[in-house]
UniProtKB/Swiss-Prot annotation:
This is Putative nickel-responsive regulator. Binds 1 nickel ion per subunit. Keywords: DNA-binding, Metal-binding, Nickel, Transcription, Transcription regulation. Signal peptide: none annotated.
Amino acid sequence: MQRITITIDDDLLETIDKISEQRGYASRSETLRDLVRDAVTREQAAVDSETKCYATLTYVYEHETRDLSRRLTTTQHHHHDLSVSTLHVHVDGHDCLEVSVLKGTVGEIKSFADSVVTQRGVRFGNLHLIPSEHGPHDHGPHSHD
């Protein structure tokens, strides 16, 4: 591990200290490492569409919007190879929240996410990519015992 020195303005340092306290980090170094790691991960994912990754796609939609539930289901079935699991929550009488866990290449997953969140009636779409150095399940079988 390398030690570096950086210069940060007071307002930014105050924000970093607040994040550190809120999340329970033991030091600024741990906070900065995680923040930098997150930024680097997002940049890597954005650069190479062939990078293997895991992802979560979270979105809220109005289930009463004409044919939306059917269109979303059709879209998911057309991309079944990317889907690991989907959680469906009835938020209230009008809205549903879905969280899809995905695996595949960045390009495939971004394309799928775009086809979901751009549908009329879908709101609050968020895609979180986690690049995988090894492709999904390249490590072989494992046990939780």
